[in-house]
Amino acid sequence: MRQYFRRKLLLYLLTFVAAVTINWMIPRFMPGDPVQSMVARARLENPEAVAALQSYYTNLFGLDVPIWQQYLNFWGALFRGDLGVSIWLFPTPVWDVLVRAVPYTLALLVPAIVLSWFAGNKFGAAAARSKWLDNTVLPIGYILTATPYMWLGILLAWSLGIVVGIFPVAGAYSFALQPTWSLTFLWSLVMHWFLPFLSLFLVAFGGWAIGMRNMIIYELEADYANYLESLGAPRRLVRRYAFRNAMLPQITGLALQLGTIVAGALVTEIVFSYPGVGYLILQAIQVQDFFLLQGAFLFIVAGVLIANFVIDIVYVIVDPRTRTGMRGATA
């Protein structure tokens, strides 16, 4: 088992290095010059002052050295925990900007992923043994899982936010409030959070429900299920075994779909102007903030890889066949 986890850890480290390298390269191939943008913001008329300021910013951000040296400097700073300084919010460190945005993204992602996975699996399992639920879940589930996150977010904002007027459609809390621990502010947080969360939850819920429904039907027709029924085992016991076996592909599916759900969360934040990492990325692209883009993508890459590694560990714990295979391979 240790050898298995060592191989997995090495694979994830190589993936991390490759992803971070691509992340570092993309902003540098984007059109535009962020240093020129910062100099233009100063509105200087003296050519010597403009040249001096441009030289200062170029040296400050390390853009005056060869590209390979910039790459090595990036990794050196990364190992020190230094993500650089935001060009857009100069001189605020990128880390400080991310710390303000990450909690909003996690507040959307974690509940949406966990609740949609559990609720979708339970509902799909129930639909597999109920004709009425099956006729209801299947078409609705297909519609939900085929709906783009952005389109569903716009639809929810229009229907529940504009037409009905129940929920706000922009921001993380009311612009008239200051962040405090008061009930008024917390309620405003929840009201602004609900529509982005619902967009993520519904799309993911449909996919998990359909997947579990199909897996339960497949497992109930397997040889072991027929054998148990021929022995007179209660139908409830057969379904319990079928549910346990059907959960394994769903755990694998969670690892495979994690990147899609995270991408959906970033797009949803943009739709609702929700101040998470996704909305931050949009703003960083608009102002050509290389270092903020690098920091935001680094958080996403690291988060997805860590979550996938945890899911791998859970899969080994849940599936005894995996542990048996590891012992056999070791022997």
What are the functions of these language-model segments?
Residues 12, 20, 117, 142, ...:
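Residue-level recognition of pore/gate-forming positions within transmembrane alpha-helices
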Residues 19, 23, 27, 32, ...:
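Juxtamembrane/transmembrane-helix interface segments of polytopic membrane transporters
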Residues 2-3, 98, 102-134, 149, ...:
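Alpha-helical transmembrane segments of integral membrane proteins
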Residues 56-96, 167:
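Short membrane-interfacial helix/loop motifs at transmembrane-helix boundaries
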Residues 23-29, 74-76, 140-171, 199-205:
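Membrane-water interface segments at the C-terminal ends of transmembrane alpha-helices
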Residues 6-12:
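N-terminal signal-anchor/signal peptide hydrophobic helix marking the start
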Residues 16-69, 164-185:
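Hydrophobic alpha-helical transmembrane segments of membrane transport/permease proteins
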Residues 30, 38-42, 79, 87, ...:
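Hydrophobic aliphatic residues
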